């Protein structure tokens, strides 16, 4: 299941995969079914979809120029932030590699991405 940011469950130690997209973006719309398939195949992870315009108050100061962007985090620690090819196999390999890594890698990303990852790991009102 792919959640919206407004209905995102607490992730705890589960891997969070957040697709940052825009409704007007044709590539994002084409990627959405692939994200659904990835989520169905990985029920132990939390998948979410955010429209950077509709969810601007939650996405915050992220300045996104290319889509889709994947943010992957575990327990509030940002593992990956970057533009992804909108292909299920490519995104799946990235997600699986991050899920099985022995130690979290330091992600090179804007501070706003790390702040969003930390914010989304906890309970929401």
Residue ranges and their predicted role:
Residues 20, 36, 40-58, 64-66:
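Thiol-based oxidoreductase modules, predominantly thioredoxin-like and allied folds used
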Residues 66, 71-112:
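Non-catalytic, surface beta->alpha helical segment in thiol-disulfide oxidoreductase systems
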Residues 1-15, 92-125:
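N-terminal leader/targeting and pre-domain segments
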Residues 31, 61-62, 94:
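Residue-level signal for well-ordered alpha-helical positions
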Residues 26, 54-57, 86:
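Short alpha-helical
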Residues 2-38:
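Local sequence-structure signature of Cys/Sec-based thiol-disulfide redox active-site neighborhoods
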Residues 26, 59, 79-81:
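A generic structural signal for short coil/turn motifs at secondary-structure boundaries
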């Amino acid at each position: 299941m792919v959640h919206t940011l407004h209905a995102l469950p607490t992730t705890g130690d589960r891997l969070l995969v957040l697709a940052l997209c825009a409704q007007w973006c044709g590539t994002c719309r084409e990627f959405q079914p692939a994200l659904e398939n990835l989520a169905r195949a990985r029920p132990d992870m939390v998948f979410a979809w955010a429209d950077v315009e509709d969810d601007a108050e939650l996405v915050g100061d992220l300045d996104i120029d290319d889509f889709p962007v994947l943010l992957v985090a575990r327990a509030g620690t940002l593992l990956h932030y970057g533009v992804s090819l909108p292909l299920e196999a490519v995104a799946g390999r990235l997600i699986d590699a991050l899920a099985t890594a022995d130690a979290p890698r330091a992600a090179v990303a804007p501070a706003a991405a790390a702040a969003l990852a930390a914010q989304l790991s906890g309970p929401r009102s």
